[in-house]
Amino acid sequence: MSDRTKGGLGQWFWVCWGVAMAWSLYRALFNEAWILDDEIAHYMISKDVWSDPRELWHPWSRPGRNILQFIPAYFGLTVARLWTLALAGFAMWLTGREGKRLGMVGLSILPLLMGFQWWFPELSYPVLTQTPFMVVWVGGVFLAMRKKMAWAALCWGYLPLVRHEGIALSALFGLWIIFAPGGFARHLLKGKWNEALKAFPRAAWLGFCTFLPLIVMNVASGLMRGEWPFMMFFESKPTEYYGSGPIWLYLKHLATGAGIPVVLLMIFGAFQKWRHLDWSLWLWATYPAYLIMHSLIYWKGLFASGGYYHFIMPMAPFVALVALRGFNGLWEKYGVKPAAAALAVVVVTGLMMPQQQWGVSDNHIPGLPVLNASLKPIAPPMKQSRFGQGVKEASEWVIKNAGGAEVLNHHAAASFWLYETGVKKLEAWGGYTPESPELCSGTLLIWDAHYSVQDDFGFTPERLEKVGWEVVENFAYKSVRIYRKK
């Protein structure tokens, strides 16, 4: 084992780590809202595992994410968020250790280049798939570089349990193994049949370790839920709802997600001279491959992608390492002042988080007047949007006025506000339509202009009025309503 894999990262690394993590911690503790509604749905499913163990293998909520988060979810949303943030901090440490193994200098600022990426503060702590995927991915690289191959294979095989596209990374890891020096496929290409035969047992063992998490998930899901998650990989277009987009969209997402300053440093770093190119470095190529894969998937409208920027946030460790190369190159060629200025811009814009201040709004909700956001020097904690506040107020109205009536809702936040209040809540995904006879007279509906009208539910105002639902109360410019069935 190389000496570069031993020893600590130095006190200044930990000072910068503390500064970077403090910014995310501040937002985790003081944000009153959430960056994505999906976080609340994931959290609720993780919490429900304790009353219904089958939910551990819930396909939409991703079993790999659930396994990592269902225990802290028992203690509440804040604890689950703090645990997830701790995983992000661990990923930052793993990235630093990899930087040391690679012989990089200036590692003390690596946490700043990672923690002040624009997407990091708002996606590092939520109960979502991003941080679990990030830590397992960089953990797989970390273990492989230290020759802990079976453990590395388990990490790479665990990725598709957290996010479906992880199966492509599992496959790339398999190719990296068999084409490595001394690998099974490399011997075959050279016509060295005896050597290939000798290398085969190792390749087979690591292949088994890579597939093991998928095998366990499918067996458990089959036994407990009667479902076989692996079949989703054979359904490339489960819905047309999410559409498609330009092939370059994820390049834009990388710039506005990680942040233009750090991406410019990364580009500069990518074009610095690479002195020691060996086979191990190719495992890091899975990161740009991941970006290319998402670009192609959304371009072709496959696998219900939606083209969302947060899908590529797990690239943060790679972005930070290559940006550090850029910082070092800037220092070597132009001196300390330009390098320090570049780092300052990364931190200042990381505190500003323009994509969060401009991009997170409810202007897309039908019926709401458009609000023009003003850019503040330091991004304030997130408040509930007008729409989100409307959902909260509607939920509070139901808690006070429902009596014994059954309540149906489609927004995950409403489920969150109604949780353990004694309200008789119906399952949103129970297959109900406005005409369902199971929805008896007096049933209440927390209707919202974003989710309720989607094809999966079909609760449009016109359809509701036609079959005898009446509006009882309005909230947030009528973008949220209480309906009662006559």
Q: Which residues make up each language-model segment?
A:
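Transmembrane-helix motifs of polytopic, lipid-linked glycan transferases
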Residues: V79-L102, V135, G139
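Transmembrane alpha-helix segments characteristic
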Residues: W14-M21, M114, L206-F208, W274-K300
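Hydrophobic/aromatic-rich transmembrane helices and adjacent perimembrane loops
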Residues: Q130, L159-H164, A168, G257-I260, ...
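Membrane-lumen/periplasm interface segments of specific transmembrane helices
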Residues: W23-S24, A41, F179, K198-F268, ...
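Hydrophobic, aromatic-rich transmembrane alpha-helices
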Residues: F90-W93, F184, T256-P288, V347
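Short acidic/glycine- and proline-prone juxtamembrane loop motifs at membrane-interface regions
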Residues: E122-Q130
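Signature aromatic-anchored transmembrane alpha helix within multi-pass, membrane-resident enzymes
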Residues: F13-G18, V105, L154, G207-L212, ...
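Membrane-embedded, lumen/periplasm-facing catalytic core of multi-pass transferases
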Residues: V346-A412
